[in-house]
Amino acid sequence: KIYFDEFCEEFDYLIIANGHHWSPRIPTFEGDFNGELMHSHQFKNNEYFKDKSVLVVGGGNSACDIAVEVSRVAKKTSISMRRGYHFIPKFIMGMPSDVFYSKTLWIPQKIRLFLQKLALRFIQGKYEDYGLQKPDHDILQTHATINSELLYFIKHGKIKPQKNIRKFSNNSVEFEDGSIDNFDIVLFATGYKIK
């Protein structure tokens, strides 16, 4: 029997299938942060972040999606990335990007990679022009970040890109380029420990 708040149900078997994405990985930095530290698994919607100063840490899908959503209501939103990433639009020619990509597998890999780089450069320009770091790897050499809105929000001043965190001090964060900014919340979208 399993007891819920309002009722009880009986089952023959109980299967717990929570996978390996359940133990948040939160990097450590020098100093202490007096604001609120959160992990992306705690993010449900953007209402909690209304009128707050928020730093999102990470460069993957969750980090970028959360930064965009938070920036719609927050007083200030920044995103801290420790390296450069390639950003793949969610849709290409009206198709989900993975579906579009699967339709190009007949093209020899070297030509396909060249065309992908050319198309992204043509559509997005240089990542450095957004204040982001240049990726040190080819497209799809690592897990790509699928997001169609981050670059738009950066260019329109809704999200400020930052380098990796160097240290915390009270409510301020010092970044590796020496810049310092104050935040109410630091939200880590830095993945999970595999357990």
Locate predicted features.
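Flavin (primarily FAD) cofactor-binding/catalytic cores of flavoenzymes
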Residues: 1-61, 65-85, 89-91, 105-195
